[in-house]
Amino acid sequence: MESERPDAHFHDPFARKLAGAKGDEIVRTLKDGTSMAWAMIVRTQVFDEIIMAEVGTDGIDLVLNLAAGLDARPWRLALPQSLQWVDVDLPDILRYKLETLGDAKPHCSYEAVEADLTDATVRRELFARIGARSKRVLILTEGLLIYLTDADVAALATDLLAIPSFTRWVIDLASPRLLKMMTRSWGKAMASGNAPFKFAPPSGTDFFRELGWAERAYHSTMEEAERLDREMKMMWLWKFIGRFYPARMREEFRRMSGIVVLERI
């Protein structure tokens, strides 16, 4: 785990406890699970940095974390006490997380909302309630969109845009090329768990522009991995081969995977 490295970028004292034996089993049995952990490390660190920057300098007063899963950022990040943080996920997931965290105290105001985000009525009512109590909201959908259809993502984007205080939205985004690679490696395993990979729009972030959300910042996973010294094995070979590709192809590789900050237009 990243937290246990001497040069760790982040320290999550709750990660191993939350992951439990099931988490170890997934990493052990999933093809290339350990060797591909670099991408999750990079994503986590970049999300951390974006959150701290948005909260610290851009006046965000509430973070809405959709499909929050086992994310323990309210407990491990040095967030201001005045910040409101709302986790949304299915009941079993949130209850397991809170029971596992036990007496640990979050650094900010924290609320766990049990909700099925696939229910449009429930989703819209939740967004309206959150929007009414905040001035500037940062939305997080870390690790979520890739499991949704284009129509699902479009509906979510539309519902988020309907709330004036929802100003920024942080996503992770895959390209069609990466989706094919991931499907070849892990597609059967993910499909057997009822979580097939789906969303990787050919138009990239333009998909969201058409829905009222513009790209504010794009953090290439490959570039961030180099910055953080967490590159995948054989990346040097990818870089060498890339020198011989035209600029258009190099840009396609750069945007194969990224963390994106969107803002309402």
Question: Residue locations for each model-derived region?
Answer:
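Rossmann-like AdoMet
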Residues: 1-113, 120, 124-129, 133
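A short, conserved alpha-helix within the catalytic core of class I
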Residues: 112, 120-124, 147-165
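A short SAM/SAH-binding and catalytic strip from SAM-dependent methyltransferases
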Residues: 136-151
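Conserved beta-strand signature within the Rossmann-like core of class I S-adenosyl-L-methionine
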Residues: 138-140, 157-176
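Short, glycine-/aromatic-enriched active-site segment of Class I SAM-dependent methyltransferases
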Residues: 179-195
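Short alpha-helix
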Residues: 195-220
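Core SAM-dependent methyltransferase catalytic element
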Residues: 230-265
